[in-house]
Amino acid sequence: MAKEELLELDGIVDEVLPDSRYRVTLDNGVVVGAYASGRMRKNHIRILAGDRVTLELSVYDLTKGRINFRHKDERATGGGGARNSQFRRR
C-alpha cells in the first residue's frame, strides 16, 4: 500500500496560537490551522505572523496542515551581518 498523497500549498501566517500552532491563510483564501514540522522544531526555526510558508495538507482533512518550509524574506539582511567588530567570535 502506497503512502497517501499530500497537497503542498503556499500561504501567509496570520496568527501565532498557543502550543506551537499557527493560523495560515492560503493563496486561494482558505484559512487553515497548522503546526511546525519536527525538523523545523529541531532546528529552532522561528515562524512569526506575516511569514510566507509552505504547507502540506492531507487529502483527508483540508483544515489542518504541517508547515515544512519558511520562505526567506527579501527585505531582510543576512543573519547578523551588521555586527560591530567589537563582538566578533573567536
UniProtKB/Swiss-Prot annotation:
Main location as per UniProt: cytoplasm
GO molecular function terms noted in the UniProt entry: ribosome binding; rRNA binding; translation initiation factor activity
SUPFAM superfamilies with a match to the protein in the record: Nucleic acid-binding proteins
UniProt keywords, alphabetically: Cytoplasm, Initiation factor, Protein biosynthesis, RNA-binding, rRNA-binding
Localization in the cell: Cytoplasm
Signal peptide positions (record): none
Source organism, top-level taxon: Bacteria
One GO CC term, this protein: cytosol
InterPro entries: NA-bd_OB-fold, RNA-binding_domain_S1_IF1, TIF_IF1
Subunit architecture: Component of the 30S ribosomal translation pre-initiation complex which assembles on the 30S ribosome in the order IF-2 and IF-3, IF-1 and N-formylmethionyl-tRNA(fMet); mRNA recruitment can occur at any time during PIC assembly.
Family the entry assigns: Belongs to the IF-1 family.
Function as written in the Swiss-Prot or TrEMBL entry: One of the essential components for the initiation of protein synthesis. Stabilizes the binding of IF-2 and IF-3 on the 30S subunit to which N-formylmethionyl-tRNA(fMet) subsequently binds. Helps modulate mRNA selection, yielding the 30S pre-initiation complex (PIC). Upon addition of the 50S ribosomal subunit IF-1, IF-2 and IF-3 are released leaving the mature 70S translation initiation complex.
This protein's name: Translation initiation factor IF-1 2
